[in-house]
């Protein structure tokens, strides 16, 4: 039987999810007990089990919440990206926002528990799909009309980039050392002017470049 509508949505449920995000962000998954989450949110811990079947269900709801919020933030910034330089700059800014929002911590903590709890791994995989599509759409936009468009598989590249970015996030979560990430974005910034000519649109037959 499905949960009643007031259990699926509403301000109380949102408050519980927000408290879970903040607790995981501050104390990690090991410290995100029902009591700790309730203390963070200032509510009775019995409410957690009224709205969620288990703590795992709440943890996944917390990840869904941060993932949706970050996706909206990324989509809002896509219009700012008109060149590879923009892509590197915006990418660095969004990474900083991911850290501050707690998304990286929530994701990393749940990934670490996925081997022991397959249902978590399956849901994380589902939540990664919109990020792969967003990445592929961005790549398609950059290569459209260029000589590299017919020779690359943007879907495979998108999968690889999302996995690579996830790896960067995992490393940062382990030691909080931003120097590696800074060095990586600095390298991308240096490579952008070199790569840009390869992404210039190819002359079209009948265009103004034709005699």
What positions do the PLM features span?
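Hydrophobic alpha-helical connector segments
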Residues: 61, 72-104, 154-161
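Amphipathic alpha-helical segments used for helix-helix packing
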Residues: 86, 99-125
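Solvent-exposed, amphipathic alpha-helical segments
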Residues: 15, 19-26, 73, 77, ...
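Residues in soluble alpha-helical coiled-coils and helical-bundle/repeat scaffolds
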Residues: 53-57, 78-82, 99, 115, ...
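Hydrophobic/aromatic-rich alpha-helical bundle segments in the mid-to-C-terminal region
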Residues: 85, 119-125, 129, 142-211
């Amino acid at each position: 039987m499905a949960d009643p509508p007031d259990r699926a949505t509403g301000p109380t449920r949102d408050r519980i999810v927000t408290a879970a995000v903040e607790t995981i962000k501050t104390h990690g998954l090991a410290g995100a007990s029902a009591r700790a989450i309730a203390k963070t949110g200032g509510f009775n811990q019995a409410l957690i089990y009224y709205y969620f079947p288990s703590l795992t269900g709440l943890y996944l709801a917390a990840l869904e919440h941060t993932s949706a919020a970050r996706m909206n933030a990324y989509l809002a910034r896509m219009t700012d990206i008109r060149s590879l330089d923009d892509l590197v700059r915006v990418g660095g800014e969004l990474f900083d926002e991911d850290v501050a929002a707690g998304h990286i911590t929530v994701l990393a903590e749940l990934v670490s528990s996925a081997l022991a709890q397959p249902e978590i791994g399956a849901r994380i995989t589902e939540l990664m799909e919109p990020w792969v599509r967003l990445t592929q759409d961005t790549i398609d936009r950059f290569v459209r009309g260029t000589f590299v468009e017919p020779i690359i598989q943007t879907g495979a590249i998108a999968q690889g980039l999302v996995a690579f970015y996830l790896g960067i996030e995992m490393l940062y979560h382990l030691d909080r050392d931003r120097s590696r990430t800074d060095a990586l974005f600095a390298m991308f910034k240096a490579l952008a002017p070199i790569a840009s000519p390869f992404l210039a649109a190819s002359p079209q037959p009948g265009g103004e470049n034709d005699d």
